[in-house]
A protein has these predicted regions:
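TPR-repeat structural position
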Residues: 82-83, 116, 149, 186, ...
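Generic helix N-cap/helix-start motif at coil->alpha-helix transitions
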Residues: 29-32, 61-69, 95-103, 130-138, ...
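TPR/TPR-like (Sel1-like) alpha-helical repeat modules
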Residues: 129-133, 161-162, 191-198, 219-242, ...
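Alpha-helical segment of the N-proximal tetratricopeptide repeat
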Residues: 57-94, 98-105, 111
Length: 255
């Protein structure tokens, strides 16, 4: 099914005591991935650029051990062993405090371990050192979990859609919409997503995520027909991706 036509113009939290809403299209802990690390140095699983950055920022005499320890941290992260990734990432940080890549991976490991304050600290350092907003959606989500929705929206507003991948920009808008909903600004949250390009010729994962979140917000706002149409669009694109088919049936039956 194609996305629904335009209609007239729903609070998700991720903190420890959150009343969780279904996540759109992929689990929350899959939000935020390190930049590409495939490499010619296959045994290290690091790009040549990353290796150069590590050696350039390492404390004197620590370049080789830093590359080894950080490589192991990245490997643990890839395997979902976030405790080990954090332990090795902290060791890496002490050897190269100004390495943006180290702070980025460590922040993402803390994020996936639901350790919001530590994640925000490290991802803020990554943002400051690198000048990149690539991880702002994840950083903003940390502030949502810490019940600071206004700061979350500010971080999402920093993301320039012309300078990041579309998926990053859309993710920022999704997080911002959730933060607005956290503050009870449901109509603003809906309007934020409705301003996106939601009717592409070919729908990518980030489009489906935006459709799902918009459907969720509309349902929570009591706009059930429009919500059902967006869930139908998600289900039509990939019936296995989310619980959209079940939500369609529930809305059809009025449950």
């Amino acid at each position: 099914m194609t996305p629904p036509r335009d209609h007239e113009g729903g609070r998700a939290r991720r903190g420890p005591n959150a009343r969780r809403r279904p996540e759109p299209a992929r689990a929350k802990r899959e939000r935020g991935t390190p930049r590409e690390r495939a490499t010619e140095a296959a045994s290290l699983h690091l790009t040549d650029d990353v290796v150069r950055e590590l050696r350039a920022t390492a404390r004197p005499g620590k370049g080789d051990i830093l590359v080894k320890v950080f490589s192991e941290s990245a490997g643990a992260f890839a395997e979902g062993d976030y405790g080990t990734a954090i332990r090795l990432g902290e060791q890496s940080k002490h050897m190269a405090l100004r390495a943006a890549t180290v702070r980025e991976l460590l922040g993402l490991a803390y994020y996936r371990a639901d350790r919001w304050q530590e994640a925000a600290r490290e991802l803020s350092a990554f943002r400051r050192i690198s000048g990149s907003t690539e991880q702002n959606p994840v950083l903003a989500d940390c502030y949502r979990a810490m019940e600071k929705p206004d700061r979350a929206v500010e971080l999402c507003d920093e993301i320039d859609g012309r300078s990041v991948a579309p998926a990053v920009f859309y993710e920022g808008q999704i997080v911002a919409a959730g933060a607005l909903a956290d503050s009870g600004r449901m109509d603003e949250a809906i309007a934020r997503l409705e301003r996106l390009e939601l009717r592409p010729e070919v729908a990518e994962q980030h489009h489906l995520r935006a459709w799902y979140v918009l459907g969720d917000l509309l349902e929570r706002r009591g706009r059930f027909t429009q919500a059902r149409e967006w869930f139908e669009a998600v289900a039509g694109a990939d019936a296995e991706l989310t619980d959209a088919p079940e939500r369609v049936e529930r809305l059809r039956s009025g449950r």
